[in-house]
Amino acid sequence: KLVDKSYQLVSLKDIGTPDQEIALLVEEISNRPEFKKIMGQAAEDLTRKEDVASLMTDAMRDAVGGDFAFYNKGGVRLNELRKGEITMEKIYKMEPFSNYIVVHEWNLNKMEDFILKDYNRGKDPGKRYINYYISGGKYEIIRNLQGEGIEVKFYDARGKWLKDKQKKYKIAFSNYVASSNELVKGGEVTDIFITNAIAVYLQ
């Protein structure tokens, strides 16, 4: 039985010397051979978060043979990837949550509903933003004069505007999105961790 609780916000910038015991533990784990294993090579610098997200979502889509993949913006934790070796450590820095892939079969109407409901969450139009990266194509949000999203146009990888509202597409999501978004609940749960999907995709 919980009888009391208390908490205190601590600014990380105010922390001076890190705890020595924890620092040694982090160093020990970081130096494990499995984290140093080279899974692939980056032919050039990926200098934008969007580029790193493209790698992640391409790997998700490829892992399930999907048409599209979506991944939330806040889940991409590596903002850039420099040219050269890509180790498992870097992959875990991209996606440190042990998320796995959940698959849905959706038509364009369901995809549009998914994007618009998320985009229109914020009441202040000036603070609305696109939250989901996509692989397999691109999408465009059409807004009214009040800044509210009213339509989404989806395009395939060749830039063709997709207009068949009844055709279903195989779409990969992370289990985080599937558990936190009412529209994405359910679906086919796979045993494919996103980190493993990235590692396989790079090889």
Where are these predicted regions, by residue range?
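Catalytic centers of hydrolytic enzymes
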Residues: 1-203
